[in-house]
Amino acid sequence: MAVLNHLEPQRVFRFFEELCAIPHGSGNTKAVSDWLVDFAKARGLRYVQDQLNNVVIFRDATPGYESAEPVILQGHMDMVCEKEPGCTKDMAVEGLDLVLEGDTVSARGTTLGGDDGIAVAMAMAILDDDSLSHPAIEAIFTVDEETGMYGAEGLDVSVLKGRRMLNMDSEDEGIFTVSCAGGARADCCLPITRSAFSAPVLEIAVTGLVGGHSGAEIDKGRANSSMLLGRVLCALEEKTDLRVISVCGGLKDNAIPTGSVALVAADAGAAQAVCAEMDAAFKKEYRVNDPAITVSFRPAETALLPLDESSSRSVVCMLTCLPNGIQAMSADMPGLVQTSLNLGILTTGDDAVHASFSVRSSVATQKQMLIQRLRCLMERLGGSVSTHGEYPGWEYMPQSPLRDLMVQVFTDQYGYAPKVEAIHAGLECGLFSAKLPGLDCVSFGPDLKEIHTFRESMSVASVQRVYAMVVEALKRMH
C-alpha cells in the first residue's frame, strides 16, 4: 500500500516510492535502470542506457527557452544497503518498507536510500511535468556511486551538450557545495598461514557503535569497530598466548563500521578479563559519541584452523598500526577535514586477511601520500595494497554564474543567503568536472539524516522547499 501518495509534490514522492519498491543497492541497479528507460519510453523522451546501466534522459527546451544553454540534472540511482541487527529483509531482492511519521520518511529496519533516491525522483518529476518552464534538460542517472563512482567514471559524456550541472547529491538544506575531496579505495591484503593450536575457541565482538558516512561524518568523533577490535586483540595478546582465527567487520568502505567480530583461540579467563577491561575503557572514551558501545566474548566453534603465531601477530599489528580517521585539517578552510581514511570492510579468507579503506583528501598529493603510507606498512608485514575507484577532487571555481543564480534563487525563496562551502565527502561533480572542461556545477539537496545507516531519514518539508527552488531556478535559466 502506498505510504507517500498524498504528499506534495505528488510526482516527486510517487516516483520516490516507486523507486524504493525496486531493490537498487550498489551493483544491483539493472532493474532500476530499466525502470528509468521505461519511464522515458512512456513519455517519448530520448534516452541513452549504457552497458554499465547508466541512463541519460533528454527533454527539449520549453517555448521561449530554445536558445538557452542546456542544463544537466544529476543524481545516482544506487543506495547503500545497511540493516539494523535482527532485520531479516533481503535487500538484494526486496523493496523497502517506508515509514511516514510526521515530517519524516524512513525505512523500517534499513537504510532509506534518500541518498540519492530523492535526486532521482526530483529529476523524474521535472521530466514528467509539462507545466514547467526550462531550458533543454539532460538528466543523468549514474550507477555505483557509493562503491567508487564507477558509473560516472565510465559514462560517455559525448552525448552531453550542457556545461552547467545541478548535482542533487547533498544532504543539508541551505548548503550549496562547490568543491569536494578526491578519493580512492585502498585494499590491503595480508597473507596468512594456519596451523593447529590447543586453546578454547572464543568469539570477541565490538558492537553497538553509531557508525555513519566515512566522509561527511568522519569528524564526529565516532569509533571504528574494526580498529577497536584491534585494540582488544592487542591487549589480549599481551596477557596470554593468542591465535587469531578470523576477523571481520563492516560492509562498505565508505561507512564507518558499527560492529566487528574476531574468532580467536586463547585462554577464556584472560579473554573475559580483557574484554571487561576494554569494555569499561571504551564506554568511558566514547560515552558521548558511542554510548551503546559493548565489548563481549563467548565460547564459539569453527572448522577453521587458527593462524600460526607469526600470522596472528601480523594481523593484530595491522589492526593496531594502520592509520584511520582524520589525518589533516584544511589550512585554507577552518573546520574542513583535508585528509582522512576509514577502514570500512574487514574480512578473512582461507589464506589472507583483507582490509578495505576509503581514502579521501582535497589535496591530491596528500591522498597519494596516505596510500603510500598504507603500502609501506603492509609491505613491512608481508602484505600488499591495491587501489581502485580513484576519483578526482572538485576544485572551487572563483567565477560561477550557476552558483550566483542558485544563491539568488535561494535567497529570494528563503529570505536569507545559503551557506556556500566545500565538503570532505566525494561527489561525482569531480569526475564530471574533469570530463567536461569548463563545467559550472553546484551540489545541494534536502535534509537527510544519518545516511548510510539504518537510522537514515528524510524531511518531507525540506524536499518540498528544495524542489520548489529547483523549479524556480530552471525558470530563470533563460
Where do the PLM segments sit?
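Active-site-adjacent substrate-binding region
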Residues: 224-227, 231-247, 396-439
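Fold-level recognition of mixed alpha/beta catalytic cores in primary-metabolism enzymes, strongest
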Residues: 135-225, 237
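His/Asp/Glu-rich mid-to-C-terminal helical/loop segments that flank catalytic regions of hydrolases
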Residues: 222-239, 268, 313-320, 328-331, ...
